[in-house]
Amino acid sequence: MKQYLELMQKVLDEGTQKNDRTGTGTLSIFGHQMRFNLQDGFPLVTTKRCHLRSIIHELLWFLQGNTNIAYLHENNVTIWDEWADENGDLGPVYGKQWRAWPTPDGRHIDQITTVLNQLKNDPDSRRIIVSAWNVGELDKMALAPCHAFFQFYVADGKLSCQLYQRSCDVFLGLPFNIASYALLVHMMAQQCDLEVGDFVWTGGDTHLYSNHMDQTHLQLSREPRPLPKLIIKRKPESIFDYRFEDFEIEGYDPHPGIKAPVAI
């Protein structure tokens, strides 16, 4: 995960001071890309411990089309608490858009099922895309999608994915996002009988919050360790039937965790 540390250093060296929606303040750059060959290991940051339980449960929650934090709480995941209303609802965020994008005639489009069918039946298509950026429903969402748009690509029997992330909290959010989409690529590849290829991450407003600077310098002082390996213990009948117990990360030996405040 040397690329991740290089991005942190780039933001420190080249970032512009900007105000932001949260009032915290950031150092920000615009436009950055990283490529991770998933054959080389699972891209889980090793210079601090990442909470893998939260990453896995959040992705399973997205895939169920769920937008209420009750499932997350049942599994001791609190990463969405700050944005939920008194009933635990978040509005039509990621899960809703992925699984039930509304159409003008009252139907709903299941984008995940659609891209799975494309991968199986038309893998050379240039339209294998999922979008969470529904302009017509942004004002109903507790938080507008940060990781907004992703595209799959098949070549030589390998499945790759590129994500466009319009807004990226480099210290807290990005390690989660990289691991989450890498996990999704592994799951989709298994369902389509493909090998994994690359995960390409593309960031728009890529920033470090002003109250994460000490934590960033601490993390930059640490040497990355070898990447772990993801093991999927079974192949469910559907992408929607995976369970938390299906996943095992082998050889994860990170440095200690580093706490930092969330900008809301």
Swiss-Prot record:
The active site is at C146. One of its GO terms (molecular function) is thymidylate synthase activity. One of its GO terms (cellular component) is cytosol. DUMP binds at R21, R126, R127, R166, S167, C168, D169, N177, H207, L208, Y209. The keyword Flavoprotein does not apply. InterPro entries: Thymidate_synth/dCMP_Mease, Thymidate_synth/dCMP_Mease_dom, Thymidate_synth/dCMP_Mease_sf, Thymidylate_synthase, Thymidylate_synthase_AS. Pfam families: Thymidylat_synt (PF00303). Pathway: Pyrimidine metabolism; dTTP biosynthesis. It is found in: Cytoplasm. Its main location: cytoplasm. The keyword Transferase applies. (6R)-5,10-methylene-5,6,7,8-tetrahydrofolate binds at H51, D169, A263. Keywords: Cytoplasm, Methyltransferase, Nucleotide biosynthesis, Transferase. GO terms for biological process: dTMP biosynthetic process; dTTP biosynthetic process; methylation. It is an enzyme of class 2 (transferase). It catalyses: dUMP + (6R)-5,10-methylene-5,6,7,8-tetrahydrofolate = 7,8-dihydrofolate + dTMP. Its EC number is 2.1.1.45. Homodimer. Catalyzes the reductive methylation of 2'-deoxyuridine-5'-monophosphate (dUMP) to 2'-deoxythymidine-5'-monophosphate (dTMP) while utilizing 5,10-methylenetetrahydrofolate (mTHF) as the methyl donor and reductant in the reaction, yielding dihydrofolate (DHF) as a by-product. This enzymatic reaction provides an intracellular de novo source of dTMP, an essential precursor for DNA biosynthesis. Belongs to the thymidylate synthase family. Bacterial-type ThyA subfamily. This is Thymidylate synthase. It comes from Escherichia coli O9:H4 (strain HS).
